[in-house]
């Protein structure tokens, strides 16, 4: 079993996507399964568990090198801030299947902020812009005296670097067809190679003004020159989606741009120059990327794991946001999704409808945790002894 670039490189050699699984992190916690070569169905929890099990094996080796005979069994696992409760539960379940004792599921932006604050001794209002391979979220938090108060979060669990790759693939195919190349009968191997090269071109455009895609058919060579300007144009709507989320999160936090002290860029996709330029134009600030955007989340998770093991961290317990003598870090979170109840349609009520039901929001998005909410429910008929609650998130 291979992962990441090694898996893609093997795929280009094998020439088959039959046993390839891409971006299943997006589908974890959803009723979606993938087909395997032997036609069995595997859900995203199992696929995630396979990846985590590989991490566990590597951690076992590291643990033995550190003198721990049983290796490393405890784990803190990070997830996108915009994950639902089902996705978080599924991730924790995947960790258990992989053999980990999951100490905590923590939001990736929070982990990144912990790493940055720990390394740079940073304080103040922090905006974390997290664009990974498959997901995107933005979080605004206040960091003061080792307390991390999440003010607002938003995101898109189906937007990431792979979507920018797909735009490149589409553009390359379109340009080659203009040159007379038939792109409708590509082999599986050619499709994998095209996707892999598109990702390489995207990476190259992060440091170069242009990149060339070369394609050969029966010894005849064709080329597509892609400039940063072209790449920016074909992905403009994706960039705009992230900008809208940033602005809405800032509004939800109750802050203004001049009140933001630090902007952290997290995730490999934030290396794209247009991301950094957009942030500069929006905020008037220079985004921070002096810590590796690929590893900053893991750094924060490891710091947090050490604090958890030593009972030096608490989550949302302190309503005043202050640390105690034993707590070196306090994390206060918010609900990333609104939570509501579905009721039968009532034409006199002005709610958002879902089929034959209307959704009544009970807990608005970005509500501070912990919280308690009460809602009065009324029987439809006299003597009604039971009812079904349909909960939305």
Would you name each region that the model predicts?
Residues 1-27, 37-41, 61-393:
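Oxyanion-binding/catalytic loops of NTP- or PPi-dependent enzymes
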